[in-house]
A protein has these predicted regions:
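Substrate-engagement module of ASCE P-loop NTPases
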Residues: 158-169
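N-terminal pre-P-loop "Q-motif" helix
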Residues: 12-24
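Conserved small helical "lid"/interfacial subdomain of P-loop NTPases
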Residues: 199-227, 236-244
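Amphipathic alpha-helical "lid/sensor" segments that cap RecA-like P-loop NTPase cores
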Residues: 224-269
Length: 269
């Protein structure tokens, strides 16, 4: 119910961000348009992306591929799962063909046959040709983890290629950043086809909605002062609202009480 440590992926647990969800759906349903969602850590980017993506695949009948990036990822590995849908496995770099025989001192013979994917998969235009006809949404989360600026630039270049051809393959990029340029490596012409959405902190009303929704499911009651205390401590970050509410609820359940007041919140902290 209160999930501070994992992004929300169930619609019935998601609260707030109605405007942003509608904005994302409208953009991804627009021909040639893709989405870049960015903002501070803890504002709920991944949860919003999960819910918006889930809604889109229901509305548009698209397949969903999710890639959560790590520091070891590169341009090619970002699209590995999407390419698998085309029957292309870039993890197979080569195969060895070996035989064993002996004729007058001539022994084992071995040759290597290269598939050639590893060079091609570095090219945005090659990736584009393989993916352009897929009716798929690729959600690229934690894109800020990508270390190489050239890899980020290639992703932006691929998005432009997809946009120019009005491809049904859509890309939804999510990452921690102060500006969109940090995630696109300053690609000069991607702005017209990549809707940039900066996710700001949540309003107090949205944070209270998180508390009310969770407490109703747990059959607990947070007092008015307790809610305002949690909101003040959260400073607009839903991560902290979930965390403090979770710890307060755990304390109430342990103590076998249903009402949570400001003292219980302070004790949970």
């Amino acid at each position: 119910v209160f999930t501070p440590h994992t992004p929300i992926n169930q619609e019935n647990l998601f609260r707030g961000r109605i405007t942003e969800v509608q904005q994302i759906l409208s953009t991804l349903n627009t021909p040639g348009q893709h989405v870049l969602l960015f903002g501070d850590r803890g504002v709920g980017k991944s949860s919003l992306a999960n819910i918006a993506s889930s809604k889109l695949i229901k509305i548009a009948g698209k397949d969903l591929v999710i890639k959560r990036c790590s520091k070891s990822d590169s341009f090619s590995t970002i699209f590995e799962s999407a390419l698998m849908k085309c029957g292309i496995d870039i993890s197979i770099q080569s195969k060895n063909i070996s035989g064993s025989f002996s004729i007058k001192g001539i022994g084992c013979q071995e040759s290597t046959e290269y598939n050639g994917f590893m060079d091609k998969v570095q090219s945005p235009s090659w990736i584009y040709e393989k993916l352009k006809d897929l009716n798929t949404l690729l959600l690229i989360d934690e894109f800020d983890s990508i270390q190489n600026k050239e890899d980020k630039h290639k992703v932006a270049e691929l998005i432009k290629l997809l946009s120019d051809s009005n491809s049904s393959f859509k890309i939804f990029v999510v990452g921690i950043a102060e500006s969109a340029e940090e995630l696109t490596a300053g690609h000069p012409s991607v702005q017209r086809c990549l809707k940039e959405i900066k996710l700001s902190k949540m309003s107090q009303r949205e944070l209270v909605d998180i508390i009310n929704s969770g407490s109703a499911k747990l059959k607990l009651n947070f007092t008015r002062d307790a809610k305002f205390r949690i909101c003040r401590l959260s400073s607009g970050y839903p991560h902290f609202t979930h965390l403090i509410s979770l710890k307060s609820a755990e304390g109430a359940i342990i103590n076998e009480v249903t009402d949570i007041d400001i003292d219980d919140v302070n004790e949970a902290i």
